[in-house]
Amino acid sequence: TAAAVHWLAWRYTRDHLAAMTAALAFTFCFFRMHHGHGHLNLIWCFWIPLSFVAMDRWAERPTWTRLAVWTTVLVLQALAAWYQAVLIVVADALFLVWLFAVERRTPRFSRLILQGLVGALAAFAVVWPFARYYFILHSEPPSYASGASADLVGWFVPPENTWLGQWLLAHGVKGPRWIWGEVTVYLGWIVVGLASAGVVVSMRARDALTRRARFFILLGVVAAMLALGPFPSEVASGSFGWSPFGLLAHVPGLSLFRIPARYSELLNLALAMLAGIACAALHRRFGLRGRAVTMALTLLLLADFYVVKFPGGEPQPFPVPPVYKYIATLPAGAVLSLPDYARTDLWFQEADYQYFSTAHWHPAVNGDAREFPPQFVEVADRMKRFPDPDAAATMRTTGVKYVVLHAGQRGAEDLLAPAEASPDFRLLVRFDRDYLFEVVPAASTPAHTSAAP
């Protein structure tokens, strides 16, 4: 991410120190510190700044090679996560309009349309096989989006997990939020100050290179308006209307963007770029003294975002249980782990099974998700009746070959004895309180008969 933003900023400043400041301001912004411990897909956003570079080069000289580069960048970002797909579509759409409406790029219109259509079709062909599964999800109402929208407190009050936030709390100031809130999207005082100077510089500049940075003012304003979510009138009516977020909520696919505050990612990128513009102007005017000030401010902005007193404490080793490593030595077959935590109060523990599956890479039934297809829920509920015969029959028809029973966990301790006695399951191995059962093929299972009346 830092390298991508550095390259983008250098193209606007031709100043590596200023570009470095922009890169660090975005890479270590609090939004990324906030999501970096739980939503890794939300920090895999380095393709967005690269898309600006690729699109700029294509608009300058629309060759098929440059189109292929831009399309590839767009597709790779979209595949990272649906949120990132929406963010790059919004960012690139804005930049495309800027290039042709404001900067007056004038390539041959017919060539532009042809290449644009080909690129769009190619991107759709690659992304759709993955994206189509998102359309089982339902859109959230304005009331939900309103509760996950950014606000001035979230943007400008240092969180309690920063040095400044701790200082404010120590002096009795109420307002700092904790790091685990979706609306804790602190922008950073140093970055906002530098970006404000960058706005002035780009608006007053006479050289074409610096004037081009005005695009990031537009990007920041649009991102902020989207991050603020729906209007109060939309919340009251229960339907999206004419707010920027509400307008996008009417677009299929884009309507699945549930949490407006996450548009702050684009706002952070815009602020970082404008901060780089301010630093470059400082260097041009004051030379070495300006560079010294930039280095000092860069250290301060990093300190501004530095996370202290993280609620989860220091990361602790979390080894994969040996039973999953043993599965890697067995023939291919899908794996079910129990107890199943999906759709329970302990839903977050379901993701552990996804992590454990990296030890064997067999197909796994378990997994955390925002929403489950109804057919999957029905089948999974039958399998969770383990070790009932109906559960075994469902496993056979769906290709589930192995069942890991964590008998030491609440909700699983009473399943061990019936499982060991069941003719449908064969105990393969035991590691402490973790038991691995194999689903016995139907041909090898004695017929189940009902007791005579």
Positions of PLM-derived features:
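Membrane-helix boundary/interfacial segments in multi-pass membrane proteins
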Residues: 35-42, 148-151, 170-183, 222-270, ...
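Hydrophobic alpha-helical membrane-interfacial segments at the cytosolic entry of transmembrane helices
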Residues: 72-73, 96, 106-131, 142-151, ...
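Periplasmic/ER-lumenal interhelical loops and adjacent helix-loop junctions
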Residues: 124-201, 260-264
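Extracytoplasmic
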Residues: 206, 283, 296-453
